[in-house]
Amino acid sequence: DGGYLDDAIVKLTPDGEILYEKSVSQIFIDNGLEHLLFAYGSFFDPDPIHINDIQPVNFDGEYWKKGDVFLSLAGQSMVILFRPSTEEILWKRQKNIFYQHDINIINEEEISIFNNNKRLFYQKKDYIDGHNEVLIYNFKTQQVSSYLQKSLEREDVRTPGQGRGKILSNGDLFVEETDYAR
């Protein structure tokens, strides 16, 4: 009722001691993206961020460093790569992802994103445009591809909320279609 949900990221020790804490709204403000928090015209969204997934980076590479984090922000239909040590958003993607969830690091230059393809219409009615998909973003080529799209289409995978997609080491795709319990 008139409130504002401000998600945050927190790094804890195994004993629960807080090592780092930062409001995602403040991350946006510090990186010149404040306009995205209030870009709804006359409609007030009390949850403009809504973190769906945080994927920590556990190794150094050309495009990220150990300690960086990928954030899946459903309220923005955005994925960002954030570096807590400098408080800088290194990369962001909003194109052709809708209320996405799970992010996984595949290798030194690729991530996967579970794209729900959910459209949210007036009065918050959900609609899935086709089916869910697992997208692969390649940082080297800056290209996006859809992984096993025909299989997801054939199986009619279309969870509007939640969901996971993990590419296994043998190339198989493990999918959790949460809202339909499969």
Where are each of the predicted segments found?
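Histidine-/acidic-rich catalytic cores in large beta-rich domains
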Residues: 1-182
